[in-house]
Amino acid sequence: MSTNRRRLVILVADSAGCGALPDAAAYGDEGSDTLGNTSRAVGGLSLPVLGRMGLGHVTAIQGVPPDPAPTAFHGRMAERSEGKDTTTGHWEMMGVVLREGLRTFPRGFPPEILEAFVRETGAPGVLGNTVASGTVIIQELGEEHQRTGKPIVYTSADSVFQVAAHTDTVPLETLYAWCRTARRILDPWRVARVIARPFVGTPGSYARTYDRKDFSMPPPAPTVLERLVEAGVPVVGVGKIPDIFDRRGITEEIHTAGNADGLARTAALLDRVDRGLVFVNLVDFDMLYGHRNDPAGYARALEELDRGLPAILDRLGPGELLALTADHGCDPTTPSTDHSREHVPLIVHAPGRGGGDLGTRATFADLGATVAEYFGVRSEVGTSFLAEVTR
């Protein structure tokens, strides 16, 4: 390992928002506060590491009071783009702000999309075509799917075309091929993501697997990731990061099977990588607990993150940075099972630098601007806070 290490780690706690944005009511999300409401629903959280880093300053979290002398810099970021989904949030982090929201289909997909999908994939038809919870719809339609071979197609409040299939009925590679075809069909419709949703099990006890795969629209403009790669800076995408950016601006991909695996792989990665950006998505918060309105599970996942952080923090030295944030909210305490329009936390660990208040940032793109300045590449969107965390 080189003694001249220069690494920046971004951990995205997927959906861990910290309070409704001013326009949240327009999205049906007034009062949402994923971290705060989760803490109160379970009678308090135990997050000693994150608490010392200053997480208690970003919103009122039961069990995590504001630390008077935090060890990291703390703040929160507001989303400037229209929307509240994974793609929009991650793209904005890396400097692409969407002025027009990506298209959603609250009444299902029109016949011309489904007819093209069936014709071009050779699938025997589709089931569903509705807004649904993925874990619910596979229980409702899984048996019919296995009997007919028809994939289950559904969407949500986000810009997604989701295709669920049992791995014994539709082999994984066939499902991926169908989703690649759907991606091509849906590009003109401005659908952010096509998501392959494989599942296993028997009627009444179907379960989704970690072999989900996202097929994203390419970002409409160059991201900070692409500029890093052009400048020769390695960019390692961990979890679903490569999928979100259509693999643009990624030099290495690491697949994960949940948050614990993602944290362990990130720590191991830091033992062999001495330069570049390590960009990590931890999806369990959103996939397993937020959408399922499970505050107890969400709380356990936050505590798991807290336990896993030291192994990563201990591998970073002077001049290196770690930023912990989120891409949107998904408050498990509200009636909705969809994402919520929220601020996201910003916790920045700069070894040897202590902590301080970064305030409320006007856009997620401030993070990308900071990454760009750290590695010496340009960015047009956002205001870097690098000087504030390295002074």
Swiss-Prot record:
In which pathway does this enzyme or protein participate?
A: Carbohydrate degradation; 2-deoxy-D-ribose 1-phosphate degradation; D-glyceraldehyde 3-phosphate and acetaldehyde from 2-deoxy-alpha-D-ribose 1-phosphate: step 1/2
Looking at the keywords, is Metal-binding present?
Answer: yes
- Catalytic reaction annotation: 2-deoxy-alpha-D-ribose 1-phosphate = 2-deoxy-D-ribose 5-phosphate; alpha-D-ribose 1-phosphate = D-ribose 5-phosphate
What InterPro entries would the database entry show? Answer: Alkaline_phosphatase_core_sf (IPR017850), DeoB (IPR010045), Metalloenzyme (IPR006124), Phosphopentomutase_DeoB_cap_sf (IPR024052)
Residue ranges for the region (Disordered) are 61-88
Gene Ontology CC, one term:
cytosol
List compositional bias (Basic and acidic residues) regions by residue number.
76-87
UniProt binding sites for Mn(2+) 2:
D286, H291, H339
Q: List where in the cell it is found.
A: Cytoplasm
The similarity comment for this entry is: Belongs to the phosphopentomutase family.
Its name, as the record gives it, is: Phosphopentomutase
